[in-house]
């Protein structure tokens, strides 16, 4: 597959161009320099060609992240057949632009200069200075207004090898890593991929954007999404927007890894568990930094986890140490098992045999001598498995009984570890004027 890297100094519009070419708002975009720190991959289609685009952090930023960002950019350049060098001619070339140009010449990749923020032909007067970069004729574009993008891609395609037309592929399993800042999400991602794809530091909030990384495990393709750490109260507008991007990444995911710090479990984990619960996606609780828990504190740590995460008690737990590579493969293996269950469908005949036996063996809610009667059960959706149960009185179903029933469905019907939804449909003389209720767990 063809690969193209997008580079440039901070705040020239690299992420805006990346988002425009990929076709959805993947990277955090704001008027603050240095918003993107990690190298982010996305897939674009151009005239039946699949191209991997890599959006890199702002180079020569002059801050504490400069060296780490440049190392990530150099990693992103490996395997790239061409480079889009984004500049802001309206602001004029800076010392950082020339530093980036010298760096690109040393790497020896084909370079196309994209003169961004040229919103109309009258701004073309700013282009003359760009010849001094030494990469030939620049392409005038506006990522914000989609101007000049075809011209840019034609120049890019001239440097790419011939590629076969797209062949339909099995969709990868998308997994989001969520957690509060500094619990080790990026370290886990790096441990899984055996590379330094995400910047890791002791300072909370290092990851500001949702970072997508493709990976293959056991013949299964994955897209691993390292999201920004979610705080109780965001400190800045950028953090607020990054949280929104994290929530959007969760919405597009198939599986959620809820990463918690084994040495520091608090009320914030409850909020994140609620977020995962509400998504209806399978959740794996990844208890990271497990190696730092003393033996005498193991039982207390488990007790705290049970208390904070009681409403997702069905979710499996994996105990990990990103530093020691402990439990890393278990995360992916468990995700594959849950994904298969999440997509499963149970025959109606099997469901109703189970329902009949259940009602014979187990007491049902009873109000004023009138018992709840469940007549029929069928699966109406997958991902997550959703079951409609036809009964005489939906209002007889208490929350406790419903949760109990959902747990038995998981255990008895091979759905352990995943969320299950129930829809109650009334049938019979009490149906008139009553509404079926829907529950989720």
UniProtKB/Swiss-Prot annotation:
Keyword terms, alphabetized: GTP-binding, Nucleotide-binding, Repeat, Ribosome biogenesis
PROSITE patterns, per the entry: G_ENGA (PS51712)
Binding positions (GTP 1): 8-15, 55-59, 116-119
InterPro entries: G_ENGA, GTP-bd, GTPase_Der, KH_dom-like, KH_dom-like_a/b, P-loop_NTPase, Small_GTP-bd
A single GO molecular function term of this UniProt record: ribosome binding
Described function: GTPase that plays an essential role in the late steps of ribosome biogenesis.
BP GO annotations: ribosome biogenesis
Binding site for GTP 2: 179-186, 226-230, 288-291
Ranges for domain EngA-type G: 2-164, 173-343
Pfam families: KH_dom-like (PF14714), MMR_HSR1 (PF01926)
Record note on quaternary structure: Associates with the 50S ribosomal subunit.
Leader sequence segment: none
Organism: Deinococcus geothermalis (strain DSM 11300 / CIP 105573 / AG-3a)
Record protein name field: GTPase Der
Similarity remark: Belongs to the TRAFAC class TrmE-Era-EngA-EngB-Septin-like GTPase superfamily. EngA (Der) GTPase family.
Domain KH-like: 344-428
